[in-house]
Design a protein with these regions (language model features):
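Alpha-helix-loop-beta-strand connector modules within alpha/beta enzyme cores
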Residues: 89-115, 172-176, 364-382
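Active-site mouth loops of central-metabolism enzymes
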Residues: 45-59, 117-126, 162, 210-223, ...
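A conserved active-site cap/scaffold subdomain adjacent to cofactor or substrate pockets
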Residues: 227-242
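Conserved, mostly hydrophobic/aromatic
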Residues: 34, 68, 72, 105, ...
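Hydrophobic faces of well-ordered beta-strands that scaffold small-molecule active sites
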Residues: 32-36, 76-78, 114-118, 143-147, ...
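N-terminal beta1-alpha1-beta2 module of alpha/beta enzyme domains
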Residues: 2-108, 207-214
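Hydrophobic or amphipathic alpha-helical targeting/insertion segments
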Residues: 126-128, 133-151
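An alpha-helical appendage that flanks or caps ligand/catalytic pockets
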Residues: 2-40, 66-69, 166-212, 239-348, ...
Length: 382
């Protein structure tokens, strides 16, 4: 473990679980926590030309976040993107940078936990620590960081012509995060001496509102990814078939407890297409696929297949789910059917789901009016 040196002496800083602060809404006791995913970038979770009023403007993204906040949702999680995926629509190519996006939404909302998504190779730990702390103060302790190792090589080459091998990216990420955590917790000046980072006379003030640190999440599902999550983060987001979720959840919780003496929870993500009738829902879901950006999808899947072990052999099976939902869990149907889907996820060990919609600003109103009451009736929300 990298040692922190403070005023010439070694200092071990115990890291408590952020749940102990009781502040961020993502740690409340709702049985099925809810959030929005990808509402900062073009297409959101839909790689398609299907018609939508969704657009990347500040007023639009702020309206979406404020609606989620008023509904009592727990999380706003953005997608960090520096380069689109080409094809017909250049999926995610137009986007808001996530730290500044989160700072704005932190001021514009009241209770929802606002996340950044951080491609670790693109930002130095000193800069990341202070930016994160600033957002935590703006939000009053409602900030969280989604940690991504930088899997999209053409994008990462915009910053550095070399790309670390998959497992080493997680080693780099672990050291990066330990550096950030020391900046969040160390009192006085200290030195950091690691494999990837070396620095002296370090300090960072103020400290985050959350004690000892903000919420951390990660979506690594490979062996290296789950080990990183078990060791460092509070929530792991699983991109898996439903039947694999119970064993996955049990395994990662066991690893966190037995190897690192920590707690971790599991959540998932996906696309929700909820309509008044099943026929309408299936029709609109199929339209997303039929009008999908298949050249862009093939480009994306080939890159993921080669460069991200989190998906591996699942790529062909998830082909349509990349078009409609970024390979996440599809919940398609009437409000009752969507709630049944949430129930199945809960039964499989998922404590929450962050969602995308084809049309976030319009569909979240319908979700609030038709789905949320049924979730309360089902005991998934209160």
């Amino acid at each position: 473990m990298v040692q922190t040196i403070t005023y010439g002496r070694e200092q071990e800083i115990p890291l408590k679980h952020p749940r102990e602060t009781g502040k961020p809404s993502i740690f409340n006791d709702q049985k099925m926590k809810l959030g929005l995913f990808g509402s900062n970038c073009s297409g959101g979770l839909c790689m398609t030309d299907a018609p939508t009023t969704y657009e990347i403007t500040w007023d639009h993204t702020k309206s979406i976040a404020q609606k989620a906040d008023r509904l009592g949702m727990e999380a706003m999680v953005p997608v960090a993107r520096w380069k689109g995926f080409g094809g017909n629509v250049n999926f995610n190519g137009t986007n808001f940078e996530t730290f500044t996006w989160a700072a704005g939404l932190a001021e514009a909302t009241d209770q929802i936990t606002i996340f950044t998504t951080t491609h670790i190779p693109t930002v130095h730990p000193i800069v990341a620590a202070n930016m994160a702390t600033t957002i935590d103060h703006i939000s009053g302790g409602r900030y969280g960081m989604n940690l991504v190792m930088g899997w999209f090589t053409p994008e990462m080459h915009m910053f550095n012509p070399s790309q670390l091998e998959h497992d080493e990216r997680y080693q780099y990420g672990g050291e990066w995060l330990e550096f950030v955590e020391r900046l969040w917790t160390a009192e006085g000046e200290f030195a950091f001496d690691g494999k990837y980072f070396q620095a002296k006379e370090l300090e960072s003030e103020p400290k985050p509102v959350q004690n000892p640190r903000p919420v951390l999440i990660n979506a690594g599902n490979s062996s290296a990814g789950t080990d990183f999550s078990a060791k460092y983060v509070d929530i792991n987001f699983a991109s898996l078939d439903l039947e694999k979720m119970p064993d996955y959840t049990q395994a990662i919780k066991k690893k966190a407890q037995e190897e690192y003496r920590r707690q971790i929870s599991t959540m998932t993500y996906g696309l929700v297409v909820c309509r008044d009738t099943e026929e309408e829902a299936k029709r609109d879901h199929q339209r997303i696929i039929d009008e999908g950006d298949w050249p862009g999808a093939r480009h994306l899947m080939s890159i993921i297949g080669v460069e991200s072990q989190s998906f591996g052999e699942q790529i062909e099976k998830f082909q349509e789910r990349f078009i409609a939902g970024w390979a996440g869990q599809p919940l398609v149907g009437t409000p009752e059917q969507v709630v049944d889907g949430f129930q199945r996820l809960s039964d499989a060990g998922m404590e929450g789901m962050i969602m995308g919609f084809l049309d976030y600003n319009e569909e979240i109103d319908h979700f609030g009016a038709e789905v949320m009451p049924l979730m309360r009736e089902a005991g998934l929300r209160y």
